[in-house]
């Protein structure tokens, strides 16, 4: 019995000695790790607070788990240290949650850092690339790319509707009503975002014990998307592009005809947001205040009711897929722009502050409007649409007047679903450009087509000259082709093709090309072999040409700012009157 007691006592003594040894080793390891860790990594987990240096029967496995936990914490601290490399100040980790991924990335919103008393969020924020504050990258630092964007960041310096409209006038000819409506809509949109962000900041700065504002003061403003309707070449895309450039926000153009419902061959609607994120240089905060222009929405109308039972994945299906995105929701966008995958990485983008502008030609919608107004027939049932097809100018004028009275019911009758139309409270109709407006498009804007081609010829030290009658004839041809301003470039390319082939070859003396002249004869011969712009060779050739034309009975004056030929001006009223 005594031997058994002595044996038990010796075993207990050995076990106690082993426990003390384990405690000693663990304490030494922990002390060494604490001494060598950065100052901001000296924090204890919840298990440390509950069981400080406690060795249980788990033995070695417990130490392994603790070591794994410490490795995870040290990895997180290394991430924060790498994030703030080069910052000569004390850093204190306020909170740290979750395990790091297999491949290290910048810490998420769960890590908050205090630098010299000020709080800094190490989250990816606007698509940060892991750079330190003040360094290059797209994080949320003071020198990040978010600061270079406009929108609500302009605050009280955001341009007024009159200033926006004035900026549009420098690039867009005509469409005065559309420019006014768009200016007001864009101004209200970004004023709403700035108001909400300022309210959140003021709410965060006030003390929690302070009295909360009344419910009447907390009014949530909703955005107003825009739907542009007008013939091709009337300036729909140019208006949206110029607006985004003027307010300095990310802008992307999407084609509705390439979109399909999720799960079918084609592009998902989420691909639009990925393109916007790419334009914003993966700055999520900037992308969430961008402008998205979806073109050709009139091509995704519902298909006619028929015996075909197949699903309309490129028509009504696309409209259904766009509904929540247009209204405002958090969309999971695939990180690499591919289709959604259950195990793929996604980027969350909130669309409630993204301004969506949709555009379409809506061909023949004036017939639907005319039928709604009960003026589709006159007398004994003679259709108005037959008279509309009789002449070009009258057709465009009647269609423009009818488009100004378009209503939501007309769009629904055209093929858009009511839910889709309801997401666009601002309806803007654009009219077809007139002959004089097309002449202005050629000469007046900052990026006028005439100025573009003159710059191109100037690169080869050649002057490009347009006569007034040539410009007017080019505008008339564009109206005849029913392509609007888009048809002007095609006409100029055809007229100037032969001269652009010749001018790169530099000549000397009398073979030197000094100027190229586009007159009425060159425009009339457009498309015929051997015709086109006149090539003037030799020094002083342009001056001699101008002197010869001025000596004729009906002088041809030069391009911008001139009144043009009197007989041409007299033809316009007679043409309109005959129609």
UniProtKB/Swiss-Prot annotation:
SMART domains: AAA (SM00382), ClpB_D2-small (SM01086). GO terms for biological process: proteolysis. Residues 99-153, 197-216, 546-579 are annotated as: Disordered. Residues 123-140 have a biased composition (Gly residues). Belongs to the ClpX chaperone family. Residues 1-46 form a transit peptide. Residues 547-559 have a biased composition (Polar residues). It comes from the Eukaryota. The gene is CLPX1. GO terms for cellular component: mitochondrion. Residues 108-122 have a biased composition (Low complexity). NCBIfam families: clpX, PRK05342.1. The keyword 4Fe-4S does not apply. It is found in: Mitochondrion. ATP binds at residues 231-238. GO terms for molecular function: ATP binding; ATP hydrolysis activity; ATP-dependent protein folding chaperone; peptidase activity; unfolded protein binding. ATP-dependent specificity component of the mitochondrial Clp protease. It directs the protease to specific substrates. Can perform chaperone functions in the absence of ClpP. Constitutively expressed in leaves, shoots, roots and flowers. This is CLP protease regulatory subunit CLPX1, mitochondrial. InterPro entries: AAA+_ATPase, ATP-dep_Clp_protease_ClpX, ATPase_AAA_core, Clp_ATPase_C, Clp_protease_ATP-bd_su_ClpX, P-loop_NTPase.
């Amino acid at each position: 019995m005594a031997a058994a007691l002595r044996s038990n006592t010796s075993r207990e003594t050995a076990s106690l000695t082993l426990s003390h040894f384990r405690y000693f080793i663990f304490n030494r390891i922990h002390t060494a790790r604490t001494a060598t860790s950065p100052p901001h990594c000296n924090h204890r987990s919840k298990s440390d607070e509950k069981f400080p240096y406690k060795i249980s029967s788990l033995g070695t496995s417990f130490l392994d788990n603790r070591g794994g936990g410490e490795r995870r914490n040290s990895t997180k601290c290394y991430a924060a240290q790498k994030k703030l490399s080069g910052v000569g100040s004390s850093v204190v980790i306020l909170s740290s949650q979750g395990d790091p991924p297999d491949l290290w990335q910048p810490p998420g919103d769960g890590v908050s850092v205090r630098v010299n008393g000020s709080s800094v969020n190490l989250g990816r924020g606007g698509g940060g690339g892991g750079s330190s504050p003040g360094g290059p990258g797209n994080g949320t630092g003071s020198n990040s790319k978010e600061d270079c964007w406009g929108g609500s960041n302009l605050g009280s310096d955001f341009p007024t509707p009159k200033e926006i409209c004035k900026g549009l006038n420098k690039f867009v000819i005509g469409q005065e009503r559309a420019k006014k409506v768009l200016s007001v809509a864009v101004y209200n949109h970004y004023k709403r975002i700035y108001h909400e962000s300022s309210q959140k900041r003021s709410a965060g700065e006030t003390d929690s014990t302070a009295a909360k504002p009344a419910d009447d003061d907390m009014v949530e403003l909703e955005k107003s998307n825009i739907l542009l309707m007008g013939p091709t070449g009337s300036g729909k895309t140019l208006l949206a592009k110029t607006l985004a450039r003027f307010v300095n926000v990310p802008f992307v153009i999407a084609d509705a005809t390439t979109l399909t419902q999720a799960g079918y061959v084609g592009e998902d609607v989420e691909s639009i947001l990925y393109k916007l994120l790419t334009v914003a240089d993966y700055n999520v905060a900037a992308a969430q205040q961008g402008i998205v222009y979806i073109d050709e929405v009139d091509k995704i109308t519902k298909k006619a009711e028929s015996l075909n039972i197949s699903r309309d994945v490129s028509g009504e299906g696309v409209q259904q897929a766009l509904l929540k995105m247009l209204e405002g929701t958090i969309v999971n966008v695939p990180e690499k722009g591919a289709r959604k995958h259950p195990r793929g990485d996604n980027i969350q983008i909130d669309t409630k502050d993204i301004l969506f502008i949709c555009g379409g030609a809506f061909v023949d919608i004036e017939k639907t409007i005319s039928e709604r107004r009960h003026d589709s027939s006159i007398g004994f049932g003679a259709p108005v649409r037959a008279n509309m097809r009789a002449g070009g100018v009258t057709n465009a004028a009647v269609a423009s007047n009818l488009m100004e009275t378009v209503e939501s019911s007309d769009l629904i009758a055209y093929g858009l679903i009511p839910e889709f139309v309801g997401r666009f409270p601002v309806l803007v109709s654009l009219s077809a450009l007139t002959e004089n407006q097309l002449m202005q498009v050629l000469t007046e804007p900052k990026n006028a087509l005439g100025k573009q081609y003159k710059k191109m010829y100037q690169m080869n030290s050649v002057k490009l000259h347009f006569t007034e009658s040539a410009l007017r004839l080019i505008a008339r041809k564009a109206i005849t082709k029913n392509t609007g301003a888009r048809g002007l470039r095609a006409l100029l390319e055809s007229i100037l093709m032969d001269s652009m082939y010749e001018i790169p070859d530099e000549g000397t003396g009398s073979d030197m090309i000094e100027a190229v002249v586009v007159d009425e004869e060159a425009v009339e011969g457009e498309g015929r072999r051997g015709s086109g712009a006149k090539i003037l060779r030799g020094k002083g050739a342009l001056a001699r040409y101008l002197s010869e034309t001025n000596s004729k009975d009906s002088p041809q004056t030069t391009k911008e700012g001139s009144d043009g030929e009197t007989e041409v001006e007299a033809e316009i009223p007679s043409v309109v009157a005959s129609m």
